[in-house]
Amino acid sequence: EKRYLALVEGSISDDRGLIDLPIERDPVRRQQMAVRLEGKPARSYFEVLEQFGDFTYLQAKPVSGRTHQIRVHFSFIRHPVAGDRLYGSTKSPNGLGRQFLHATELAFDSPLTGRRVTFHSPLPGDLESCLIWLRKRKGARQSRTSEQLRTCEGW
């Protein structure tokens, strides 16, 4: 089980949702994945954390774990991950030189003990600086706290 933090282009109107679209390798651009009817099932839950007008900061949980799943899903709904040129991003806030996508949590059941093991990774400094810049530039609307996200139904 993985959770990601992402900044996507545009304003997502729903505070939370599910993207349920099949994914497979793009037959023309072989280095990319694409939403295709004949693809493998892929589901991504998301919760909006903050809105910045032209960007939305969110937490995403891919259920199926397909290659580039979050990037493909959000690009398909016209909200590509900021800085992700491979999947259609045209905006990079505050000169960010990479895509704004970070694996913040990994959890699994230990094969030795059977207990749930969870690892957390804080947001890297460059991504945190980007958020600070966005908050100063425009007033952010906060939707959910991290603790509220962990208790959401379906997560």
What is each model feature region?
Residues 1-155:
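RNA pseudouridine synthases
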